[in-house]
Amino acid sequence: MSKSARVATVIILVLLGATLLPLAPSSVGSDPVIRMSVTTDRYVYPLTGELEVTVSVTNLEVQTLEGLTINSTVYDSSNNLVMVLPDVSDVSVGALSTTNFNVSAAYSLSDANYVIVSDAMVNGTRVGSANVPLVVLNTAGRAPLTLAMVFHMHQPIYLNLQGEFEQPWVQVHTGGDFEYNGTWYGAYQWHVLMLEDHPGIKVTYNLQPSLLYQWNDSLLDFKYNGSFPSEEAPLSHDLTAINETVDGYRSLAASGQIEILTSPFYHPLSAILVELGWSSDLLAQIQLGKNYTDSYMGVNATGMWTPEMGFTMGMVPIMQEAGIQYTVLDQANHFVGAQGPGANSSVYQPFELNGTNGSHIIVFFRDTEISDELTSTWNSIPNPRVAASDFIAAVANVYRSSPGGVLTLASDGENPLLSDGVISALDWNAIFGAIASQSWLQTSTLGSIVSSRPVTAKLTFVPDGSWSGGFGLWIGAQPKTAIWQAIEKDRAILVNLTARYGADNIEIKKLWNYLYIAEGSDWEWQTPQGSPWFAMQAYRYANAATQYQAPPNVYQVNSTPPSQYSTYAVGIGGVVVLAVVCLILARRRRP
């Protein structure tokens, strides 16, 4: 979709700006078509006070809506009526316009979440309805809830072997996803701007090493081979946005407002590598990713984002060996089924997970439901204050049950901002603002929690799994299995080539790098339902060693295979990395 088309779509959506789907188009004498939203003057209320409600009504008809009455009521979680607000009677809304109606009343309610429901009535017939949470909270004697937000930013490498970009999405998603107030922004840049607007908010980010590399490559030597439409080609604006975005994340990290995690460089599904007996490959990718993250961003990353949250217990000693101290897994698919002394305790805390041979890491389990709502529901509500109210209501429930606890929310960071353009961006900005306004809610990075909070809950086992449950999205079905079989064949050949020519040979290092690319999770995700290009790329890099022909009389023969191959990727440096290519991340929405 061109930028002009995207602008038109955004304008239409913003003009509609409501939370209720319209009724069927009206004819003469039928119910009017309206949209409604309800907001409150505060996100959280004390036990007694004054409640102020604003009901926004948008008339989508070409004639004035007259004789409108608005009834507003309050219900508890069991759908019991607990309060009736004053009616707004016999009002009108102009054609194709929006009017706000204010209602206020004194209240006295217990500590709980309620819902305000506003119904629009014409001649005794309901023609529209909307609702919003009403959070009544007693904070006396309760320790604040710590909120740890973790966002994963990932793009695969879109470079071909000549170092040319074949896809524009690194540049577009940094500087060209949506237009706001006459300026184009991308998801990655918007996160920086939100944090600059809310300096009290602390967030943890995984900036995938393959994304960092492409930011760097774009700034140093951008090359475009013409393989995608010229209208999507990165403009000078997008490259400027990359420069500002990189500087922004570096500055935020230096100030302590954000923490930057690392990840295995090419986003492999780590558990599969371990189960296939390729633990040294995982170690190599973690070390390569950490080295690049640390050097490019000026940090010392001690936490790791586990790609796709794909986990198996065999990863614990590997992560510890690579210098990783903590990671994030899923409540529904990992904490449920965990074993150990802490298995029956609250999920709202960090856990020590003990592996083999004395190894251990710290695990934060994300709240699955709230994380999913944040990225799939509260990013597509035309009224940002409603989105923020919904978020605060969900977090307030956790605060009531676990004051002083740690609520971990973890999700993709760019995808939620791509679903509805500027609507998504404004929703999340409102949520950040709502968080900043709550004294009972404090934000923290994972590293700060680890360094300041004793970890007392211990686990001895976490079940295999990913955010989706198992690993079937990446392995199992024949088209996916065939790719893994090609990788397995190529790896066996590469082991023999390494034994013959030596682990330090630059060509051998390059081949291992290509193999690590083939191990990335993006290939299988899009096979077979996606474009054939994904499978083509997978086999191209899975067959790199198979098709390799070494020049004669160049390499020294080494008949003794090294004991492991984790050192092949470590310290490869920019020269070799410049030659690599990866897949389009299948889950990234294309503009």
Question: Positions of the model-derived regions?
Answer:
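Short, surface-exposed loop/turn segments at beta-strand-coil junctions that are enriched for proline
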Residues: 106-111
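Active-site and substrate-binding clefts of carbohydrate-active enzymes
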Residues: 140-200, 210-212, 217-220, 224-232, ...
